[in-house]
Amino acid sequence: MPVKIPDHLPAAGILESENIFVMSETRAANQDIRPMKVLILNLMPNKIETETQLLRLLGNTPLQVDVDLLRIHDKESKHTSIDHMNTFYRDFEDVRHKNYDGLIITGAPLGQIDFEEVTYWDHIREIIDWSQQHVTSVLFLCWAAHAGLYHLYGLNRKILQQKRSGVFVHRRTCQHFPLLRGFDDEFFAPHSRFAEMDIEELKQHSELQVLAQSDEAGAYLVLSRNNRNLFVMGHPEYQKSTLNDEYHRDLAQGLNPNVPQNYYRNDDPKDDAIARWHSHGSLLVSNWLNYYVYQLTPYDLSDMSAVTPWESQ
């Protein structure tokens, strides 16, 4: 959250140059405050686990957040009861007429399937297109990040020979971005995917900017230049046991998976996993919610034309 300071205080320029969020008394006096409305499109098989992971991060901020859960279809989920889905989830037709401050689109276990071959691809495209007019900021996670970059910018991914699974060191490639406030120079984040984007293609795209990357895992944080779309190539929401659960699931299915890198103590699956990314995940979602949702969204959500770009603040 911002520090409110007197108008024209000399320290303001110094703090802003250090990427510290300060707000003048004049601007603070004109701020309206209300709960943030966030929609979550949950594409993961275990709906309840993913709900818990995302709500844990959203709940770790000073802002009040009202959450709606969205499903892609009304078919029964393999890992979640239809009663749960019917009770807590909405269909797109229920929210199509609404506007939201934020939208989170989760990953999905579809890493090796061409986007156009995904059975609900048309629904994904429709929701992404809708979000560009009805949502202040969209957070795309893992598979959804690849899908969003493909649909919005025509960028395709490369399928990997082996699943990339593990916890990798990342570094900031830009400095003075609100999203990166409080980030260490290097930080950890988990990945679990069968594909990757071409980082040079991302860097050369005029509408995108790469904010963080890994020597081992490639591009990690990519932001559209209009600040409306944030693409996160990993899984900062994962809890400590998730990569372990996925590894043993793949073993049971005879997929001969590689051991997740930098995850188990001594890289031995018989030892405990080490969670190195929770503080990063909390800070990432907090910064997104504060700087790219709360600070930019209109008080009156019926008027999305009032979304304030960063350069106007």
UniProtKB/Swiss-Prot annotation:
Q: Which gene encodes it?
A: metAS
Q: Which InterPro entries does the UniProt entry name for this protein?
A: Class_I_gatase-like, HST_MetA, MetA_family
Disulfide bonding pattern of the chain: none
Q: Which family does it belong to?
A: Belongs to the MetA family.
The protein's name is Homoserine O-succinyltransferase
Record keywords: Acyltransferase, Amino-acid biosynthesis, Cytoplasm, Methionine biosynthesis, Transferase
Q: Does the keyword Acyltransferase apply?
A: yes
List the source organism: Shewanella sp. (strain ANA-3)
Q: Where is the active site?
A: C142, H235, E237
Q: Name one GO molecular function term.
A: homoserine O-succinyltransferase activity
Q: What is its EC number?
A: 2.3.1.46
Entry GO CC: cytoplasm
Site described as Important for acyl-CoA specificity, located at G111
Binding locations of substrate: K163, S192, R249
The pathway where this protein functions is: Amino-acid biosynthesis; L-methionine biosynthesis via de novo pathway; O-succinyl-L-homoserine from L-homoserine: step 1/1
Where is the protein situated, by its record's location annotation?
Cytoplasm
Site keyed Important for substrate specificity: positions: S192
Say what the protein does. Answer: Transfers a succinyl group from succinyl-CoA to L-homoserine, forming succinyl-L-homoserine.
Name the reaction it catalyses. L-homoserine + succinyl-CoA = O-succinyl-L-homoserine + CoA
Query: What processes does the entry annotate via GO biological process terms?
Result: L-methionine biosynthetic process from homoserine via O-succinyl-L-homoserine and cystathionine
